Every structure is written in structure tokens, then in C-alpha cells.
Amino acid sequence: MQKKIKNREALLSHGDIDGRKIVLDITEKTLQHLDAYERIKSIAHMEGDVLCIGSRRWDLSKKRNVYLLGAGKACNHMAMAVDEILGDHLTRGIAIVKIKEDTDVFRKTDVYVGGHPLPNEEGLRACKEIIKLVDSANEDDLFIVVISGGSSALMSCPIEGITLQDEIDTTDVMLKSGA
């Protein structure tokens, strides 16, 4: 697993070295335990054609399509784990993220960079793609959805009569008033 604290050596170059080591070790373990990618990998896996998530099981050989939908600030990591776990079973994925990272590797998932805290055009485009995908689905399709904090801004899709700019302006007013 990749280390979360990138500047460990610099932090240990001065001050109470022993105390700093203890704090950094605890912090590193905590960050690794909370990592969205690792959390998904710890609860989901494939057994042949069967997807196992916790105690639930889905035989993917009986599904027409398997889709991944995701949004949120931790979506990169969650969606990447699901994409990796499903492998060739995944038909298509759509992930709306705050920042596309250089380390993001997806096989079959389209990644959109939505706006946060203010919605943007790319988030709107992604939502329209999600709606098209959901509308084309039937009972033989399986959707796996991963949502994390920030998804309400990243997944902007105003109703008819409300523009994206209306939503941006409303969100901006709410943020400036402390909401």
C-alpha cells in the first residue's frame, strides 16, 4: 500500500523525533484504514462470476450489463477499486470526481471532473450521461453506485426551467450565507 504521508522524513528531521514518529505512525495507519480504495477492496471481491460485497452475492453471468456509477470527492478511489474488482464484467462506468488524479487508472469508466463546491458544465454533462444510461437499463442490468461527500455539487442536473447558472448562483448565495 502506498504511503499517505509523503513528507515523513522532513517531519522527522527536527523537534522531538521519538514523539513525532509515534504520531506519524498512528496518523499513517489511520489514513490507510480510511482510504476509500482500500475500504472497497476490503469488502468487495469476485469469486468466479459472482460479485461478493459483504454478505451479499450477485451472479454476474446472469446480468445483461454491469454498470458503475459514482460521484464525490473520494469517488476516484472507490470507483477505481470497483472497476478493478469487476474487470471484464464491467460494461461501463461513469465517475464524477472533484479532481482527476495522475494515479487514477480506469479500464471501462469514463471520468468527469465536476465542480465543487459550485456545480459546473462537465458535472451536468456527466449527469445527463448517467440519466441516459439508467433510462436504457432493464431488470437484467446491475448498477453499482459509489457516493461520497461533495456529490450533491458534482452531480448537478437542474430540472426543466432551472438553468445551471441558476443553480450555481443559488449555491453561491447559500455558501456565502453559511449554509
Specify the residue positions occupied by each region the protein language model found.
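N-terminal loops that bind phosphate or other acidic moieties
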Residues: 1-179
